[in-house]
Regions:
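ATP-binding N-terminal substructure of ATP-dependent carboxylate-amine bond-forming enzymes
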Residues: 1-107
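Protein kinase-like catalytic core scaffold
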Residues: 152, 206-209, 263-268
Length: 325
């Protein structure tokens, strides 16, 4: 995958329009000859109107999904696949060698890392075993013996996008939500400034940049207002997490709280482009360019922290209008 030719396929592209636009901008800026393709379950995915070609594919968990992607890769001479949702990361990691067999790279971390990230119990165990501060999770026995203090946080250990995450204030709420939320995990409630951290890592674990973003406001688990912060305590803590992870590749998104006393406590790992990545890119952290370069064989030797701090993003909705016959 050398030279200035590259075709990229974004899977489960959905509403990630700005990310698609940013990659197309880099293509134009550096003279990449190629196309940006998208694939999604729906023909009405907004990204379909901004990519060069859109493909309707089965659900990620349906038989035939991988075969359909392989067909697209062969017909469109795809060089790189970038999966964009949590639910397909393990599947893509498990099939990365199949794609490599036809000359296609998949921007996905190791199977082991994706299993850690996909199950919040495994995420918690990873943090604890590596002495990385994280909110305490209570065992069933501790809950039974009432060895906790309110408020608590309850969430499904296999959930995503903050679905089912609920603050618990008393025993009545705890009893209700234990029954209401399947696969519930109960942990101490942590307050403070909440950050998302975008980290770029090459195929050999070398870090290019780390960008903390303060989450000012969220909607459906995705940041709607945020600001970049050159907080080197958070940057150093994030580097510790990345170095402990098994074979991280590409954009790794971490989440943490910074408490009033300055302690940084991590809560989540998402080994993919996060929804708020356009803020980091706009600040000067060129994730699209670095993605292209690493897939062309570049190894990250020097870190790049030449991005703007205190850049604020205020997101809003735009609409596409069409006639569907």
């Amino acid at each position: 995958m050398g030279g200035n030719k590259m075709n990229i396929l974004f899977t489960s592209s959905g509403r990630r329009v700005t990310l698609i636009k940013k990659f197309k901008e880099v293509f134009e800026q550096v003279g990449i000859k190629g196309k940006i393709f998208t694939a999604d379950l729906k023909e009405t995915a907004p990204t379909s109107y901004f990519s060069d070609k859109h493909f309707i594919v089965p659900r990620v968990n349906e038989e035939g999904y991988i075969n359909e992607l392989l067909k697209i890769c062969r017909s469109e001479m795809i060089n790189l696949i970038i999966p964009l949702i949590d639910t397909e990361l393990i599947l893509m990691a498990n099939n990365s060698e199949v794609f490599e067999g036809i000359g296609v790279k998949v921007l996905v971390s190791s199977m082991e890392l994706n299993k850690i990230a996909n199950n919040k119990k495994y995420t918690y165990n990873f943090f604890v075993s590596n002495n990385i501060p994280t909110p305490r999770v209570y065992s069933d026995e501790e809950i039974e013996r009432k060895e906790y203090q309110f408020p608590l946080l309850i969430k499904p250990y296999d959930g995503s996008s903050s679905k089912g995450v609920t603050k618990i204030m008393n025993e009545k709420e705890l009893e209700f939500f234990k029954e209401y939320i399947s696969n519930a995990m109960i942990q101490e409630y942590v307050s403070g400034e909440e950050y998302t951290i975008d980290v770029m890592v090459d195929f050999y674990g070398n870090i290019k940049t780390i960008v903390p973003r303060l989450r000012i406001e969220t909607r459906a688990g995705e940041v709607s207002k945020g600001v970049t912060k050159k907080d080197f305590d958070i940057i150093q803590a994030a580097e510790t997490v990345i170095k402990a992870l098994p074979n991280p590749i590409g954009c790794i998104t971490l989440q943490c709280f910074k408490k009033e006393d300055g302690q940084i406590t991590f809560i989540e790992i998402n080994p993919r482009f996060g929804g708020g990545i356009p803020l980091s890119i706009e600040a000067g952290a060129n994730f699209p360019l670095w993605t292209i370069k690493m897939c062309q064989g570049e190894v990250f030797i020097d870190k790049d922290f030449n991005w703007r701090g205190n850049l604020t993003m205020l997101r809003y909705d735009e609409a596409i209008f069409m006639e569907i016959v």
